[in-house]
Swiss-Prot record:
Induction: Expression is up-regulated during co-cultivation of A.fumigatus with Streptomyces rapamycinicus that triggersthe production of the polyketide fumigermin during the bacterial-fungal interaction. It is found in: Cell membrane. This is MFS-type transporter AFUA_1G00970. One of its GO terms (molecular function) is transmembrane transporter activity. InterPro entries: MFS, MFS_dom, MFS_trans_sf, Proton-linked_MCT. It is a multi-pass membrane protein. SUPFAM superfamilies: MFS general substrate transporter (SSF103473). Keywords: Cell membrane, Membrane, Transmembrane, Transmembrane helix, Transport. Residues 201-225 are annotated as: Disordered. It comes from Aspergillus fumigatus (strain ATCC MYA-4609 / CBS 101355 / FGSC A1100 / Af293) (Neosartorya fumigata). The chain crosses the membrane at residues 21-41, 60-80, 87-107, 112-132, 145-165, 182-202, 240-260, 278-298, 301-321, 327-347, 364-384, 393-413.
């Protein structure tokens, strides 16, 4: 059987679409970017504000924040598909700012947990997920690049917030409360711009033409075009979708461990406190390029193909973690891991969006992110337990193993695209590189 595919020409990109990308970048700079800078907070809490707490207790603040960020994704996905992004963005932005200013008043573990984990985590979810659905709808022909750019905002945030905290706390001696308040005042205009600029594409007066998919079998007869109602088949019945949820779930068990523990590893190998904190900034700077460049490549050679490669690359890099002992080597290692892991974070939305109709982009991305909530909750505390009992070697082996297992499952999902043509029809897959 021969499959011929004709794609409609990509429409010109509107100013509205560009503004949505910029607004989404600002949104993720203030949300995920703040989360990935938690390593700096963790170091300060361990040495000063929460001195005496165990290596197991403090990571729960960051993990719970990420958990609530991800567990809110399915709800946000459904709401943004139904009501649009504005209400979610405004409510979430207010919640983020309230949480930031509440952190500045905290001095006890339970207070920090309620403000930085619970309130901030939930509020960030309402700001983080709407841009993914809106940008996917605005730029369907450049989804990998567009989502790479907006997730690049989290990399910029990880750099900016880490350096700001370090500068204000140690060099300016501003104190923890006012340092956190400065962060909040910096976020205010960025979140306001995100609320204004992230808008849905204009509704079409007629349904957009679907890609023509014609199949010719031996004997000259052609198979019928897939029925439109196939597009509404529930995602949770898709073998491919279930496989990518499992694959990302395994990978996310260890994905964030280097971001949380690279500073303490550097300090343990002779780096100064300032240099150790800058390791997080170096890693986040590398993720910026990792989120954008692989997105450009993935739009050409396939999102699933690139995802499998970067999962394997991240896993192999993690296995080499404890073999790096010099400062120069640690910088190179941080760049390598940051680049490959950045691609994982940016392309997951493109992989999910590939199997959904334009109207269901929010649901597809939301269900995927929601399925990762438990693994991101327990991943870093498990890493902390391994570190406390067995050292960094066990932490690096755990991180590498989860990423490689994720790559294997993603490889299975990739094979399912070729072996299940009916499911490909049902989800409007193009039988091209995936």
């Amino acid at each position: 059987m021969t499959v011929a595919i004709s794609n409609p020409a990509a429409p010109p990109v509107s100013a509205r679409a560009y503004l949505s990308v910029i607004g989404g970048t600002c949104a993720l700079l203030c949300t995920v970017g703040f989360v990935v800078a938690f390593g700096v907070f963790q170091g300060y809490y361990t040495e000063h504000l929460l001195r005496g707490m165990s290596e197991f207790d403090i990571p729960w603040i960051g993990s719970a924040s990420i958990f609530l960020l991800y567990v809110s994704a399915p709800i946000c996905g459904v709401l943004v598909d139904r009501f649009g992004p504005k209400v979610l963005l405004i409510a979430g932005s207010i919640g983020v700012l309230v949480a930031i200013f509440m952190i500045s008043l905290c001095s006890q573990y339970y207070q920090i947990f309620l403000a930085q984990a619970v309130l901030l985590g939930i509020s960030m979810g309402f700001v983080t997920w709407p841009p993914f659905a809106v940008v996917s709808r605005n730029l369907p022909h450049h989804r990998g690049l567009a989502l790479g750019v907006i997730t690049g905002g989290s990399s910029v945030g990880g750099i900016v917030w880490s350096i700001m905290i370090e500068e204000l706390l140690t060099k300016r001696n501003l104190g923890f409360p006012w340092t956190v308040r400065v962060l909040g005042f910096t976020m205010l205009p960025l979140l306001a711009f995100a609320c204004i600029s992230i808008t849905e594409p204009p509704k079409q007066s007629q349904p957009q033409p679907r890609p023509a998919l014609e199949a010719t079998v031996e004997g000259g007869s052609a198979s019928p075009t897939p029925k439109p109602e196939y597009a509404s088949l529930p995602l949770l019945r898709s073998t491919v979708f279930i496989s990518i949820c499992v694959g990302f779930g395994l990978a996310f068990l260890g994905l964030f461990n280097p971001f949380f523990y690279i500073s303490s590893y550097a300090a343990g190998h002779g780096a100064s406190a300032q240099t150790s904190s800058y390791m997080i900034s170096i890693m986040n700077a590398a993720t910026l390029f990792g989120r954008v460049i692989p997105g450009i490549v993935a739009d050409r050679v396939g999102h699933y193909n690139v995802m499998i490669f970067v999962l394997l690359a991240s896993g192999i890099t993690s296995f080499c973690w404890t073999e790096v002992r010099s400062l120069t080597g640690l910088v190179i290692w941080s760049i390598a891991y940051g680049f490959s892991s950045g691609a994982i974070l940016s392309l997951q939305g493109a992989c999910a969006g590939k199997i959904a109709t334009p109207q269901n982009q929010g649901k597809a991305i939301g269900f995927l992110q929601g399925s990762l909530a438990v693994t991101v909750l327990v991943g870093s505390p498990i890493g902390g337990q391994l570190l406390g009992h067995y050292g960094y070697l066990s932490l690096s082996m755990f991180t590498g193993a989860t990423l490689v297992m994720g790559a294997v499952v993603m490889g299975y999902a990739r094979l399912c695209l070729n072996r299940s043509p009916m499911e490909a029809h049902q989800f409007r897959f193009l039988l091209a590189p995936n």
